[in-house]
């Protein structure tokens, strides 16, 4: 069994004065016209499960206009077990409680992880490599309590290294010290992200085959030392990308050595550009369909299939690693998917995690699905401020 959300309470959160949605089942469909606060409910759930918001707002913006504080609460159940997640937003700060005891965002994440799917995610395949790294990192911080530390320690070393490079320094004891720190923390972050991507992709292939059996999906995790130039990244055939060493064969020391070696090789280029050109902030994750780079050659439908499969595989991987089903948050994606992809998505959610879906149109769902769903129609009279 896994924790399930049974009710949501919002007070002075975004545009909501007071909202309570309870008696929630395994599938919750939130339906209503645009700009009535559907996405705000999804954001609140993410804030109370992942400890973050995909909107990345200043926290003051989540508080209703003219109010000093905002408040959101989830009630969760697992059999006879009851859990309450609460966040209080005040100014640019937020504080969490679980069953009345103060918790950090990282401590909150272990109770009920979430997987979020928004229309912006559908651009993930052709977006910049930083977006794909962010997507994997967002999953990783929920799977490992140590991952945020890995990332922050690397970012600190990277900032210091960049400051020295901007000052024209690429040698000497001070630079060598931060270069070593950059390699040590970079190796840890790279290996953790690479291993997660490897496990995620192994699940993606099975799901993809069920949706597009006539196509072969491949992927490459391309660490920074394998990305020799932008020209190489433009190549569309998978055979033109050297197969990196299998992740299970790489050690931290191997990656450290590669990063330090690349640092020496790129010293002139880094001094010219004033930034670090090596490290996990430059790693790439590329997908291929029938051997061709999906970013360059796949149709929009094929690219969206990859993203859909990545999200569904994330749900399965969370369940495998944490032993609990995450809550799946789908914000207005049904309108962006064709009938085949909607069918694949609804077939998945019928037998998997608790799911919250926002939509403007119930016609995207079969009568059978709606018969088993909790349908919440918004706006609900008296719950929102009339600005």
Predicted stretch roles:
Residues 102-111, 118-184, 223-225, 385:
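A conserved P-loop NTPase coupling/switch region
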Residues 1-33, 173-184, 188-327, 336-340, ...:
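Conserved NTPase motor "head" modules and their coupling/switch loops across ABC/AAA+ ATPases, GTPases
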Residues 49-131, 135-147, 202-206, 262-264, ...:
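Nucleotide-state sensing region of NTPase/ATPase domains
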Residues 74, 354-360:
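Structural recognition of the conserved hydrophobic beta-strand(s) that form the central parallel beta-sheet
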Residues 331-333:
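Walker B catalytic acidic pair
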Residues 46:
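Helix-to-loop junction immediately C-terminal to a conserved catalytic motif
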Residues 38:
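Conserved lysine of the Walker
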